[in-house]
């Protein structure tokens, strides 16, 4: 699986993507990271990549001509790549969208900066806009890392224990509480059922705990899974 990242801060990568399981998988060639410096496509003395928005307003926008040259370079190397743009106005990047993204062998992520990018770039290249949450970041690099992390960990061989992927959160409910040694800590005991060895009862406890946490913290997930009336 190949990821191409377009950014004005190439030094940010691989960053956290270069450590732990993902870093080892990167070194083994289970996935590939190509970083493109947008400033290299500025074609001007000062490597200027931004300009003021037409119609006025605060901040600066990444220029269409600069981004266009960068994207065209990527497309010349990877003509079948999926083009994505990290944007606070994009669709929420969920586990389902991550799985859909995994249908592509090559993915390109354009990282926004300043007040955004010229809208013509989105329209011309038909960029899929994705958001990792209802908040504003200084740039799209961190969002790109989140997206890459979410996808790469589903690549076979990246996560050592494949069973971990099957028990992941966000499958319609949040994860149940987990405990390890010592069994007693600061007067707090591990739930007795987890010490019984009765796998049927343990599974039942975990399922109920998961549903309780989800109902309290993310009832929207249960409504999506079971419907409005069943949750209430």
Swiss-Prot record:
Protein family membership: Belongs to the RNA methyltransferase TrmD family.
Chain sites annotated for binding S-adenosyl-L-methionine: 112, 132-137
Annotated SUPFAM superfamilies: alpha/beta knot
Compartments it resides in: Cytoplasm
HAMAP family xref list: TrmD
InterPro entries, sorted: Alpha/beta_knot_MTases (IPR029028), tRNA_m1G_MeTrfase_C_sf (IPR023148), tRNA_m1G_MeTrfase_TrmD (IPR002649), tRNA_m1G_MTases_N (IPR029026), tRNA_MeTrfase_TRMD/TRM10 (IPR016009)
Name by which UniProt lists this protein: tRNA (guanine-N(1)-)-methyltransferase
Gene Ontology biological-process annotations: tRNA N1-guanine methylation
This protein's UniProt keywords: Cytoplasm, Methyltransferase, S-adenosyl-L-methionine, Transferase, tRNA processing
Listed EC numbers: 2.1.1.228
Subunit structure, interactors included: Homodimer.
Gene: trmD
Pfam families reported for this sequence: tRNA_m1G_MT
């Amino acid at each position: 699986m190949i990821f191409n990242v377009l950014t004005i801060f190439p030094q940010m990568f691989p960053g956290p993507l270069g450590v732990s399981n993902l870093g080892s998988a990167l070194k083994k060639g289970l996935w590939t990271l190509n970083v493109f410096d947008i400033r290299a496509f500025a074609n001007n003395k000062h490597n200027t990549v931004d300009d003021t928005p037409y119609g006025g307003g605060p901040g600066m926008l990444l220029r269409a001509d600069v981004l266009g040259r960068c994207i065209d370079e990527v497309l010349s190397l990877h003509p079948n790549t999926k083009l994505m743009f990290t944007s606070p106005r994009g669709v929420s990047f969920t586990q389902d969208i991550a799985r859909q993204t995994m249908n592509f062998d090559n993915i390109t992520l354009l990282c926004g900066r300043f007040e955004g990018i010229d809208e013509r770039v989105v329209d011309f290249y038909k960029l899929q806009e994705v958001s990792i949450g209802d908040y504003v970041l200084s740039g799209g690099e961190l969002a790109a890392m989140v997206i890459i992390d979410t996808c790469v960990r589903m690549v076979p061989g990246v996560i050592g224990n494949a069973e971990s992927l099957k028990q992941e959160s966000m499958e319609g409910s949040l994860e149940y509480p987990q405990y390890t040694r010592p069994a007693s800590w600061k007067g707090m005991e591990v739930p007795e059922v987890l010490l019984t060895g009765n796998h049927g009862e343990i599974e039942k406890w975990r399922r109920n705990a998961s549903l309780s946490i989800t109902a309290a913290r993310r009832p929207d997930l249960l409504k999506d899974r079971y419907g409005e009336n069943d949750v209430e």
